[in-house]
A protein has these predicted regions:
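Metzincin-family zinc-dependent endopeptidase catalytic domain
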Residues: 1-101, 113
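The catalytic-center signature of Zn2+-dependent metalloproteases
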Residues: 85-149
Length: 149
């Protein structure tokens, strides 16, 4: 629950967005491992990664099954709000979207890939796709998560 302000160097003026990869890298450098299992960063700024117009979040994905390593992810809540699109606020929907995106990115930190099942790990390229997916893992993804414990 530590706060870390964004830096000017992480901002892309041409895109009017923050570089999610730079922010996540700095967040992870500033984390003291202690007894942490995973790190979830939450930012209220518009973010991008690579050539994508925007992302709801990004994650460090383990290449090998290393349970001792600390992995993290970052989600942006900016585009999850209806107000971003000039619509009336809906706090219940905002909370549901935030939960789904947090679970999705945290799933990646446990090595889960995008899933075609009815699953929170289904890729979302729009808010409608986020709204349409459930807030839980399918049986296959749930088994993979449980194998880490």
């Amino acid at each position: 629950q530590n706060s870390l302000p964004v830096k000017e160097s992480e901002y892309n003026h041409e895109r009017d967005q923050y570089n999610a990869s730079l922010i996540l890298r700095r967040v992870m450098k500033n984390i003291q491992k202690n007894d942490l299992l995973r790190v979830l960063g939450i930012i209220d700024e518009d973010i991008f990664s690579g050539n994508l117009n925007f992302v709801f979040g990004i994650a460090q994905i383990p290449k090998f099954r290393n349970l001792d390593a600390l992995f993290g992810c970052l989600i942006s809540i900016t585009r999850l709000r209806r107000e971003f699109y000039g619509r009336q606020a809906n706090i219940k929907l905002f909370k549901e979207r935030t939960l789904k995106e947090a679970m999705h990115e945290l799933g990646h930190t446990f090595g889960l890939k995008h899933c075609q099942n009815v699953c929170v790990m289904r890729f979302s390229n729009s808010l409608q796709e986020t709204d349409d997916k459930p807030s839980n893992f399918c049986k296959e993804c749930q088994k993979q998560i449980e194998s880490h414990f």
